[in-house]
């Protein structure tokens, strides 16, 4: 009888210990579940941050692409201007040569033609920064060439008339006055070209400033992309580490659940054994 009582007490203590261990396991399981939930929440936050970083990266990349497109367009525009300017410089050079030859035929108009040539020289230096007004300038240059041809015709006519009698001197003087008027008009057109060249120069300076600003923005975009790339790598590393931690905790949870199940089964076995013992005692 004493042995049975001792066995019952031992089984009761073992049952209580099993209950305590089961409660401890349940508490540990709850703690692990809470830690797991926190890590999952942090993992979700990291995923959101990763998504935001990806969006920032895409935005910066789009800005960089747009800046590169604008820069390429500016470079193409400058190249076209340089090409147009080279053609205009050649035409101006030819115009100067024609003006020099006309000086020999029309001595009285030499000074004004030289002034027009000097003005053309000045415009030649300024045309290196000429913008998209080449068509309008071509029309004005054509006008100058037409006036030059007309001046040549007047000069040749004057030479023939100088060989004639004095009675044609008055007619020659009238023709010369007309030539002077045309030369004055040519000077006015050259002055007009100088003004336009000045405006074009200012426009080219503005384009140069815009190109510099575009280059600065490109450097800024590149720096932003490098920063975002680094932040993206850091976020990926943290996400990977969080995944590994969650995996470990999940394994720990599974192990604790298995232990808890084993303890419950052991507790059930002890309870069954106690019930059987009580039944035997009742039989006595």
Curated annotation (Swiss-Prot):
Signal peptide: none
UniProt-listed SUPFAM superfamilies: Tropomyosin (SSF57997)
UniProt keyword Repeat, yes or no: yes
Pfam families: Tropomyosin
Keyword Coiled coil: yes
Ranges for region Disordered: 103-131
Keywords attached to this entry: Coiled coil, Repeat
Coiled-coil positions: 1-284
Subunit relationships: Homodimer.
Domain free text: The molecule is in a coiled coil structure that is formed by 2 polypeptide chains. The sequence exhibits a prominent seven-residues periodicity.
Free-text function comment from the UniProt entry: Tropomyosin, in association with the troponin complex, plays a central role in the calcium dependent regulation of muscle contraction.
Protein family: Belongs to the tropomyosin family.
Protein name (Swiss-Prot/TrEMBL): Tropomyosin-1
Lineage, broadest ranks: Eukaryota, Metazoa, Spiralia, Lophotrochozoa, Mollusca
């Amino acid at each position: 009888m004493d042995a049975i009582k001792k066995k019952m007490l031992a089984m009761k203590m073992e049952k209580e210990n099993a209950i305590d261990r089961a409660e401890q396991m349940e508490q540990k399981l709850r703690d692990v579940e809470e830690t797991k939930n926190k890590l999952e929440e942090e993992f979700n936050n990291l995923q959101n941050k990763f998504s935001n970083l990806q969006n920032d990266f895409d935005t910066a990349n789009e800005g960089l692409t747009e800046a590169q497109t604008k820069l390429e367009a500016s470079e193409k525009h400058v190249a076209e201007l340089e090409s147009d300017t080279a053609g205009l410089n050649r035409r101006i050079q030819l115009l100067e040569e024609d003006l020099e030859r006309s000086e020999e035929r029309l001595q009285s108009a030499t000074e004004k033609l030289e002034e027009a040539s000097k003005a053309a020289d000045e415009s030649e230096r300024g045309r290196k920064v000429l913008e998209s007004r080449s068509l309008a300038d071509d029309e004005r240059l054509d006008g100058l060439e037409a006036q030059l041809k007309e001046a040549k015709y007047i000069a040749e006519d004057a030479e023939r008339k100088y060989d004639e009698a004095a009675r044609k001197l008055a007619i020659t003087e009238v023709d010369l006055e007309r030539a002077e008027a045309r030369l004055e008009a040519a000077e006015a057109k050259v002055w007009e070209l100088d003004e336009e060249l000045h405006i074009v120069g200012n426009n080219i300076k503005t384009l140069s400033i815009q190109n510099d600003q575009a280059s600065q923005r490109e450097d800024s975009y590149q720096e932003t992309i490098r920063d975002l790339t680094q932040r993206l790598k850091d976020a990926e590393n943290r996400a990977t580490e969080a995944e590994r931690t969650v995996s470990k905790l999940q394994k720990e949870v599974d192990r604790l659940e298995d232990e808890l199940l084993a303890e419950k089964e052991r507790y059930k076995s002890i309870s069954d054994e106690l019930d059987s013992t009580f039944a035997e005692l009742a039989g006595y």
